[in-house]
Structure formats: C-alpha cells, structure tokens
From Swiss-Prot:
Protein keywords: Cell membrane, cGMP, cGMP-binding, Hydrolase, Lipoprotein, Membrane, Metal-binding, Methylation, Nucleotide-binding, Prenylation, Repeat, Sensory transduction, Vision
GO CC aspect terms: plasma membrane
Record-given protein name: Cone cGMP-specific 3',5'-cyclic phosphodiesterase subunit alpha'
Lipidation sites (S-geranylgeranyl cysteine): 859
Chain residue ranges for the region called Disordered: 830-862
Binding locations of 3',5'-cyclic GMP: 97, 116, 169-172, 176
Family membership: Belongs to the cyclic nucleotide phosphodiesterase family.
Role this protein plays: As cone-specific cGMP phosphodiesterase, it plays an essential role in light detection and cone phototransduction by rapidly decreasing intracellular levels of cGMP.
Assembly behavior: Composed of two alpha' subunits that are associated with 3 smaller proteins of 11, 13, and 15 kDa.
Organism this protein belongs to: Gallus gallus
Length: 862
C-alpha cells in the first residue's frame, strides 16, 4: 500500500464530508479539542465560526461564560464584554456594541456603554466612560428604534433604513454596512440594546447568524437582568433607609423647618450616592408690606419682574445649606446668598423654583441654557459634572425649597431611579413641613390665647377701686398702699364690711336674693367663707379673697337667668346644705372650701343657651369640648382665674392640697350637667339606703368619710340640688325665678327659629308660653322630686327643700289644671262652632236654595 500524504487525506475528507463527520465525532478526543479552544479572549483565532465548532467546543465556551457570570466579583460590563467577544468570533462579524437604556427627566434614551468590541479588543478600550457617552433619544438611530419597538432587527443595508444615524460613524471614523440589533428586556422595561456590525465574508447576516445571536444573547440578558435586579434592590434599600432615618429626624425636630431639613438631610447623606448636594430655602412671603409697595406706586422703584413660583411668590432664596461629601465632609450654611453664588449662578435652582420641574442634566458644564461653572467651584478643586435638581413641595403644593444633587459617585449620570428615590425624599420633606407649620400655628394660637386671656383678665379682673369698695383699707387704716397693711388688720376691716348672715337668712333654705343688690351679694359670698372657717385656717389673703369674689361676679354675663344671682344662689345653697343640712360632717374643711368656691363658679360665663344649642350652631366651645360643653368651659374659666396669683384663693396650699381642690372643682362643676344626673342618682340612692340602716351617726360618718368615691357621688348630687334649688324656694320667689328661666329658654328658641331655621321644642317655644305650668309639673315629677326626696331621707334637716318643692308643685299643678280646663272649654266651643258651621253648610247644600228653615219662600205644599 502506497504512502498516504497530507494532500490526499485532505482531498478525501473534502469529497466525503459524511465520513469525516462520523470519524471526528467517534475518534477525536475531548482533550485535544479542549486544548484548542480553551484560550483567553486575546488568543482566539480569527475565522473560527459556529459551523467549525463541535458541541464539545460549544459546551466549553458556555461553561466559561457561566463561570464568569457566577463570579460575583466580575462587573456586569466585563461579563458582557467577554460574551460579545465570543459572539464576534462565532458570527464572523467585525464588531459588537451595547447601548444601555435609561430615562432622564421622564424621557427614555440610549447611551453607549460598550463600543466596537472585537475578539481581540481590550475591555478598557471598549468601555465608554460616563463623561464620554454618546446619548440618543429613542427617535434617532437604530438603537433607539429597537428600544422603542422592543423588536429584533436584521438590517442588510443600513443606508436603506430610515432610522439609521451616521453620527457615531462620523465620530469614530467607522463605516457601518449591515447589522443585527436586539433589545434586552425585563418585563416591559428595556435594559439594553446589543448590536452586531458588519458581517465578514458575506453581504449580510444569515438566519443561522440570527439563531446564534439570539442564543448567546440569553447570557447577556441573564447578566443584565441580574444586575438590574440587584440595582433595584439597592435603590429600594436606599429609599427605605432614607425614609426611615429622615422620618426619625423629622419628628425629632418640630420647631423649625431649617433644623428639620438639616437634620434629615445630614443623617441620610450616605444613602444619596452623590458627591455634593445643596438645599435652597425659599422665602414664603406672598405679599409685601404696604410700605414696601409705596416706592413702586410712586414710581421711585421698578416693580419686580423676576421669576416667581407657581403660587406667585418672588423667587428669593434666603438660605442655602451646602453638604460636601467628597474628601473631608463639611457643611456650609450661607444665609442670604448672593446671586453669583456657585449654587445659584447657573440659574437651575431658580428655574426649578419657578416651574416646579425635575431637572436631570448629564453634562452640566456643556449645557447652553444654564451657565454652570466650568472650573472648580471652590478651593477643593471640585467640579460639576452632572446635576439633579428637584423642588421641595409642601401639602399645599407650595414650593418651599429646591434640593440639588451633584455628581453621582460612580461617575454615571443620575437616572430615573435616582430621580424617583430623591423625589420620594423631597416629597416627604415637603410634607413634613406640615409639622413645623402646625407647630408654628400652635405657638401663634397659644400666644393669641395668652393675649386674649390677658385682655379678658384686664376686663374681668376686679380693679383696685372695685376691691377698695369692699376692702376699705385707705379709709380705715389711713394708708396709701395695701402693701403697707398687716394681714390681720385687713381681715378685721373686711369682716366689718360683711353682712350678718342671720339678717339675710344665709343659713336658710328659703333665702331670697331679690332684696340684696348684686354688690351686696359679693359681700355675702365672702361672709360664707368666713362662716365655714376657712379664710384664716388656709391663710387666704383678704385682698385676694375680695378680688376673686368680685372677679367671679364680673365673670357672669348679664343674661336673663344664668347670671351672677343664680351663681350666688347655688353657692349659698351649697353652704346651707353643708351647715344647716349638716352634710359638712362628712367632709374636711378643705373639701368644704373647694365645694363652696366651685358652686359660686359653676355657671361662670354662661351664654344663655344650652349644650345642644352649642352643638347645633357649631360654636367653638362645641368643637373644643366633646361632652358637657358648657360645664367644661365653666371649669376651664374657673381654673384660669386660679392661675393668676392675685386671684388664687388657694395660693397658700401645698401642691397635693391644690391638686385635690382642682379635682373637686372638676367633679362639682361637671356634675351640674343634667345629662349625667341619671347616671349618678342610682348610686346616691344606694348610699342613702345604706345610711338609713345604720344605728349611729358615727357609723354613717365613717361609712362615707373614708370612701372618696361616696363623697364625690354625694357632692355631685349636692351640686344638682343646688343648681335646681330655685324650684324649692317659697312660691313668691319660685314663680318669679321660673319666669326668668322660661324667658331665657324662649330667647334660645327665638335664636333657633331665626338663626338655625329650626322649630324649637315646646319648652323653648315662646308661642307655647301658656304651657309653662304643665312643663313645670313635668320637670318636678321627672327630675326634681327624686333629688330632694332622697336628700330628705339622707338628712332630715334638708326636708324643708322637699316641702318647698311639693308646695310649688301644688301651685303649678293648680295653674296647669286651670289651663287644661280653659283649653277644654275653648276646644268644646270650637267644636260646637265647627259642628254648627258644618250643619249650616249641609242644609244649604241639601235645601235646594231654600231659606234657613229648609222651606221654600215661594211655594207652599198643601
């Protein structure tokens, strides 16, 4: 057999391709092929195509790519670069490129990331740095069109394609003939566009090339999706941390917007991913003072023609806070910044404040609209590269400031995710302004309240002259100032001016205030405190007691019934229940002191209308207090008086005693709300039942006095008894008081009819005034009888009140019956008249026009 040479073998294999394939598949060892193809990208042999590669070779390449993907240390760009190198080799194309898709200012775009990748090119040469990017909107270039349509394109001749742009060819000196382009997507979002340019040894890319291209693009897709998911995770992590920490600091500082912004922005600096950022705070003044307008109106000054915010304010940054994060961290605060400050000179913050737009600029110094400083802005040598500026908008949609962020740390321009995360931050900061605004409003309201209280005190508080009309120290002690007087002398001369309680029947349940002047009632009130022996025991200054009593009298409005006379009567009845009714034995002197004082104050500043009217009319008191509206107002008014040291009759008590007094004031005054009466009367009845079964007085005293709750229940019922006590007075007094009460109710009814456009209930309807006796009987039976009957059981000394109530019921019942009889007669008369009229009408209709007797006047029936 002859020698077989190389040429003969090669010729045989070419003529018998099926044999060659079977032989190589069966005989060629994997180690040999592996040694051929396991080479670095730089050593890849030119011209090796997918056709020339076995499955084993393909597996080796795929394994290598998977190894690169698995290596977490490798960057996304490096892995994609290696994949594109393999594709360049396999597809026999001249080069590959990758464009990254992103959005800025809400506009999508594509930017060069890997350019002109060949099987032997270096990564550093192919990677496009952020400052050298070429950016296309989606309506220019094939890459943009692919990103827009999200479709694969195989273009045999780019010059015949309407979307082709030769901008990059001119910039790089390259000539593009044909290409394949495919989008890399995640869901509906386009992440990148990969392009294969200029098929070698052919005029266009084949169907087989398309399959290979799409096949290996799965690796790039996997890498990009993994990178994008990681990036989104980082974004959300930063967003949550920013919101968490900014919320923490925002709610730490509620007093001042500058401190609030500063604390929040400084705390989250590590999550902002930028080299520097600044916050410009805008002046919130909408209207100039009138004296600032005068020069303009007189023509001495030009009106403002500069930029204004959307709500019409002049754009005026009153402060800039500059946060430097590169190099040594530093914070600069620039109050009243000049117009040529580097933060403002570009005009970008002013533009954002004027229009409220988000501005994202990738190459700021080259921008033609804004004049950014091209060189270093300060001594640190730092220069502006890219900028993201956003308005800070509060809940009223007013722009309160502008936040500007400079130079993303990785050198890339800010993208849509940076916009979103920082917009979330600025929105939160804008909304948090509500906290400081609310705090400021609360402060103003508090200050207004203090001023109003001061004005009220000035008008209500007893003047020195009024105090001197009772406490005549100048006349009797021959001094110019009360400070010169000894307290014992003041007590002595005060007692001399007070009436004798027996002369005025202050100890009697039948006491009437009608013979006494309102000024005289003030001295009577002071006398009651001396009678329960609390003035000297608790060291109440004579001047303070006199001023407080006079001020309480002035605190009552001049209305029909709930005036000072009613207030005094309730205080006198409380005194009588304690002393004459002998209930004082259950209470300490301090408690008795507080109870009488609270009784005097219980209706102070009453408006002449009830709680229901306050709610119907949406009065401020109804908004301030949810329940027992007027009673809580009387309580707050009383406490306000005690806050003034010159009116505080409890000023010499210790802290615990004073707290006890305030608590008793609350229980006593709130208890006058009749809506609470039905809740407490069962409890009071049980106490009375228990007392009746006790054999000795000492046992009863112990049963009540050691239990604060029982004492409070009794005190609450005492306040109800005092408040309604006018109905127990002698008939001559009670009938007059009842008319005053009715008149006040009718006045409220008139208001309901005219102001609220509502029909009042019968008790408040002036047109039903004749029903007053009937209403009084119903009120006595439904409310009053239980109170005084139980008190007469509780202490027989209180029986005169129950007797007075019963006598008055007889009087009202008599008048109610008379009214009923009168109404019955009227109804019967009215009924007769109606029947007569009906009969007359019937006769007229049925008589055929006859006379009154139903007979014809012209015809006689024989």
């Amino acid at each position: 057999m002859g020698e077989v040479n190389k040429d003969a073998v090669e010729k045989y294999l070419e003529n018998n391709p099926q044999f060659a394939k079977e032989y190589f598949d069966r005989k060629m060892r994997a180690e040999v092929l592996g040694s051929i193809f396991q080479v670095s990208p730089g050593d890849v042999k030119e011209g090796v195509s997918f056709k020339d590669m076995s499955r084993l070779e393909e597996c080796n390449i795929l394994f290598e790519l998977l190894t690169e993907i698995q290596d977490e240390a490798g960057s996304m760009e490096k892995i994609v670069h290696k994949t594109l190198q393999r594709l360049s080799q396999l597809l026999a194309r001249d080069r590959c490129s990758m464009f990254i898709c992103r959005s800025r200012n809400g506009i999508p775009e594509v930017a060069t990331r890997l350019l002109n990748v060949t099987p032997t090119s270096k990564f550093e040469d192919n990677l496009v740095n952020p400052d050298k990017e070429t950016v296309f909107p989606l309506d220019i270039g094939i890459a943009g069109w692919v990103a827009h349509t999200k479709k694969f394109f195989n273009i045999p001749d780019v010059k015949k394609n309407n979307h082709f742009s030769d901008y990059l060819d001119k910039k790089t000196g390259y000539t593009t003939v044909n290409m394949m382009a495919i989008p890399i997507t995640q869901g509906k979002e386009v992440l990148a566009v990969v392009m294969a340019l200029n098929k070698l040894n052919a005029s266009e890319f084949s169907k087989e090339d398309e399959e290979v291209f799409k096949k290996y693009l799965n690796f790039i897709s996997l890498v990009l999706r993994n990178h994008h998911t990681s990036y989104l995770y980082n974004i959300e992590s930063r967003r949550s941390q920013m919101l968490l920490w900014s919320a923490n600091k925002v709610f730490e500082e509620l007093t001042d917007i500058e401190r609030q912004f500063h604390k929040a922005l400084y705390t989250i600096r590590m999550y902002l991913n930028c080299e520097r950022y600044s916050v410009g705070l805008l002046d919130m003044t909408k209207e100039k003072e009138f004296y600032d307008e005068w020069p303009i109106r007189l023509g001495e000054a030009e009106p403002y023609k500069g930029p204004k915010t959307p709500d019409g304010r002049e754009v005026n940054f009153y402060k800039i806070i500059d946060y430097i994060l590169h190099g040594k961290e530093e914070i600069k605060v620039i109050p009243t910044p000049p117009a040529d400050h580097w933060c403002l000179i570009s005009g970008l913050p002013t533009y954002v404040a004027e229009n409220g737009f988000i501005c994202n600029m990738m190459n700021a110094p080259a921008d033609e609209y804004f004049t950014f400083q091209k060189g270093p802005v300060d001594e640190t040598g730092w220069v502006i590269k890219n900028v993201l500026s956003l308005p800070i908008v509060n809940k009223k949609e007013e722009i309160v400031g502008v936040a500007t962020f400079y130079n993303r740390k990785d050198g890339k321009p800010f993208d849509e995710y940076d916009e979103q995360i920082i917009e979330t931050l600025t929105q939160f900061l804008g909304w948090s302004v509500l906290n400081t605004d609310t705090y400021d409003k609360m402060n103003k309201l508090e200050n207004r309240k203090d001023i109003a209280q001061e004005m009220l005190m000035y008008q209500t508080k007893a003047t020195p002259t009024e105090v001197e009309s009772i406490l005549k120290y100048k006349e009797k002690l021959n001094v110019k100032s009360i400070e010169e007087c000894d307290e014992k002398d003041l007590i002595r001369i005060l007692k001399e001016e007070l009436p004798d309680p027996k002369d005025l029947e202050l100890y009697e349940f039948r006491f009437s205030d009608f013979p006494v002047t309102e000024h005289g009632l003030i001295t009577c009130g002071i006398r009651l405190f001396f009678e329960i022996n609390v003035v000297e025991k608790f060291k109440v200054p004579a001047e303070v007691l006199t001023r407080w009593m006079y001020t309480v009298r002035k605190g009552y409005r001049d209305i029909t019934y709930h005036n000072w006379r009613h207030g005094f009567n309730v205080g006198q009845t409380m005194f009588t229940l304690l002393m004459t009714g002998r209930i004082k034995k259950y209470y300490t002197d301090l408690e008795a002191f507080a109870m009488v004082a609270a009784a005097f104050c219980h209706d102070i500043d009453h408006r002449g209308t009830n709680n229901l009217y306050q709610m119907k009319s949406a009065a401020p008191l109804a908004k301030l207090h949810g329940s027992s509206i007027l009673e809580r107002h009387h309580l707050e008014y009383s406490k306000t008086l005690l806050q003034d040291e010159s009116l505080n009759i409890f000023q010499n008590l210790n802290k615990r005693q004073f707290e006890t007094v305030l608590h008793l004031f609350e229980v006593a005054i709130i208890a006058t709300d009749l809506a609470l009466y039905f809740k407490k009367r069962t409890m009071f009845q049980k106490i009375v039942d228990a007392i009746e079964k006790m054999e000795t007085e000492e046992e009863a005293i112990k049963y009540i006095s050691i239990d604060p709750t029982k004492k409070e229940v009794i005190m609450a019922m005492m306040m109800t008894g005092c408040d309604l006590s006018a109905i127990t007075k002698p008939w001559e007094v009670q009938s007059k008081v009842a008319l005053m009460v009715a008149n006040e109710f009718w006045e409220q009814g008139d208001l309901e009819r005219t102001v609220l456009q509502q029909q009042p209930i019968p008790m408040m309807d002036r047109n039903k005034g004749d029903e007053l006796p009937k209403l009084q009987v119903g009120f006595i039976d439904f409310v009053c009888t239980f109170v005084y009957k139980e008190f007469s059981r509780f202490h027989k000394e209180i029986t005169p009140m129950f007797d007075g109530l019963q006598n008055n019921r007889v009087e009202w019942k008599t008048r109610a019956d008379e009214y009923e009889e009168k109404m019955k007669v009227i109804e019967e008369q009215k009924k007769k008249e109606e029947e007569a009229a009906a009969k007359k009408a019937e006769n007229a209709a049925g008589g055929g026009g006859g006379g009154e007797d139903g007979k014809s006047k012209t015809c006689i029936v024989l």
